Swiss-Prot record:
One of its GO terms (molecular function) is DNA binding. It holds the Pfam family HTH_1. This is HTH-type transcriptional regulator ArgP. Controls the transcription of genes involved in arginine and lysine metabolism.
Length: 297
């Protein structure tokens, strides 16, 4: 069995993290030539390319597997070293999360871990349909995803669901939906999406009003919190998690445009197996808090 040299594997990791050889060399305090030599040595060991030399560089499928292995080794080292790490650099935990979880329940869930443990979070925000891919590529050690199936050598648990309501301000509703939400009125009402791959709004309209994708005007805004602001100021109608706008709904600042209709996104927590002690703390914290605030039915 071919075994990786972890010094050379860290060079591969640095090139991916730093998005190039020059910055990787600076990060590792070695020359750029030395970085190239280490990666070439690793590729010779496995007899295949591990890095696609694009701008920025990206790992091959085998490179992804090795980076995933490195993440596991780093966490397991933390578990074995235990108290010997007291006073050293806090452990880096890279997690892939969706913006709506980050804006609502995730940080309160992690608060006990952050208060009790020497860790540094690296939260990589991605759509919940794509977060699992970051785990597959070895970029993170855990991911909040809508995918129910675990990747090979990974664990998965159900967290609960976010229910998305179709909301707007009262002035917006009076302007665009004076006679209620109809197929015709929706064609004129500005909407918003997180990015060009975010299809929740379009899917909701297609499912409930038979509107084809791309038929409504749509802003692109990469911020979950900005969705709320856009709706409050009467700029757009939005799909927003109920958990995020409970106060606005109670006060009447925002209204549910289609009572009884909503989009449900069940969320799952994925991570490598076996879990380190620190990742077990993270898992316990996420599951405990998620089961309290997310829909379980």
């Amino acid at each position: 069995m071919k075994r990786p040299d972890y010094r050379t594997l860290q060079a591969l990791d640095a090139v991916i993290r730093e998005r190039g050889f020059e910055r990787a060399a600076q990060k590792l305090c070695i020359t750029q030539s030395a970085v190239s030599q280490r990666i070439k040595q690793l590729e010779n060991t496995f007899g295949q390319p591990l890095l696609v030399r694009t701008v920025p560089p990206r790992p091959t499928e085998q490179g992804q597997k090795l980076l995933a292995l490195l993440r596991q080794v780093e966490l397991l080292e933390e578990e074995w070293l235990g108290d010997e790490q007291t006073g050293s650099t806090p452990l880096l935990l890279s997690l892939a999360v969706n913006a709506d979880s980050l804006a609502t329940w995730l940080l309160p869930a992690l608060a006990p871990v952050l208060a009790d443990s020497p860790v540094r979070l690296n939260l990589q925000v991605e759509d919940e349909t794509r977060t699992q891919e970051r785990l597959r590529r070895g970029e993170v050690v855990g991911a909040v995803s809508i995918q129910p199936q675990a990747l090979p050598s990974c664990l998965v648990d159900q967290l609960g669901a976010l229910d998305y309501l179709f909301v707007a301000s009262k002035p917006f509703a009076d302007r665009y939906f004076p006679n209620g939400v109809t197929r015709a009125s929706l064609l004129k009402a500005p909407a918003v999406a997180f990015d060009h791959l975010d299809d929740m709004h379009q899917a909701f309209l297609q499912q409930n009003f038979d509107l084809p994708p791309g038929s409504v005007p749509c802003h692109i805004v990469n911020s979950s919190e900005a969705f709320v602001q856009l709706a409050r100021q009467g700029t757009t109608c939005c799909m927003i998690p109920h958990l995020q706008i409970e106060k606005e709904l109670q006060s009447g600042e925002l209204i549910d445009l289609t009572p009884g209709l909503y989009q449900r996104r069940m969320l799952f927590w994925h991570r490598f197996a076996p879990e380190s002690r620190m990742m077990r703390k993270v898992t316990d914290a996420l599951l405990e808090y998620g089961h309290k605030v997310l829909r379980q039915d």
